[in-house]
Amino acid sequence: MFSGSIVALVTPMRNDSVDVHHLRELVEFHIAKGTHALVAAGTTGEAGTLSHSEKLLVIKTVIEQAKERVPVIAGTAMNATKDCIELTQQAMEYGAHAALIMTPAYIKPTQEGLYLHYSHIAQSVAIPIILYNVPGRTACDMLPETVARLAKISNIIGIKEATGQMTRLQQILRLCEGSIDVYSGDDLTAAQWLLAGAKGVISVTANVAAKLMAKMCDLAMDDDQAGCLRIQEQLMPLHELLFVESNPIPVKWAMNKMGLIGGELRLPMTELSEKHHQALEKVLKNLELI
């Protein structure tokens, strides 16, 4: 249903409010660069510090600006199942093509709790759902066996798996037997995952190197292994520097350098440490992004 380079959009801020003007411009930027789909109000979009109404504003703005030219996937993760259902229903009413739902953070549910959380959501909304496993940020790891159980639910259609572990991809593909699409959630290993059967990548790097990420995914889908890996090698210094501090700190700094957004973050996120400025600027210049 969704494939290729799927950007995890940042949320531009101005005076501690959502910068709708620059958010609309980002949608146009990605469509022009060939990005295949957009994620609104996800982790990279600072969803953890957005209010409920701000999340809806971001989702609605991206959907309206995209005008059906590319699919829009709404980040609707909430820790409480009932709250997640409510937000997902609202995103569906705005016209989101799917919902990306991260595992609950901090509360550390059991595997059965995860199964019940997602199955209740899926039964309550008529929209495709993409699971999202990122244990490095949530302290919650959804195991492949749980994914396989959830894959039997008709509107659970994919998983963003951010561990970057090739064995995890192989386990999910084997257990789910094609009943669910897998998306890389780790830019550093995305090319290898694409060539091993992942459907796409939900990418931080695509915020900056949109055209190259889209090309890398196109080459992978065309089974051009050499071409795909060549672009991945070219992008590796950027991938690494975009995670020298917590996402989206580095990517917002880079986008500010590129003139795409103002670069403002919401506390407790802070600006990129000065010690990383020179290296990231050099990589952006090497890639002819500034």
UniProtKB/Swiss-Prot annotation:
It is found in: Cytoplasm. Its EC number is 4.3.3.7. InterPro entries: Aldolase_TIM, DapA, DapA-like, Schiff_base-form_aldolases_AS, Schiff_base-form_aldolases_CS. Pathway: Amino-acid biosynthesis; L-lysine biosynthesis via DAP pathway; (S)-tetrahydrodipicolinate from L-aspartate: step 3/4. The active site is at 132 (proton donor/acceptor), 160 (schiff-base intermediate with substrate). The record marks 43, 106 as: Part of a proton relay during catalysis. It comes from the Bacteria. Keywords: Amino-acid biosynthesis, Cytoplasm, Diaminopimelate biosynthesis, Lyase, Lysine biosynthesis, Schiff base. Pfam families: DHDPS. SUPFAM superfamilies: Aldolase. Homotetramer; dimer of dimers. Catalyzes the condensation of (S)-aspartate-beta-semialdehyde [(S)-ASA] and pyruvate to 4-hydroxy-tetrahydrodipicolinate (HTPA). NCBIfam families: dapA. Belongs to the DapA family. This is 4-hydroxy-tetrahydrodipicolinate synthase.
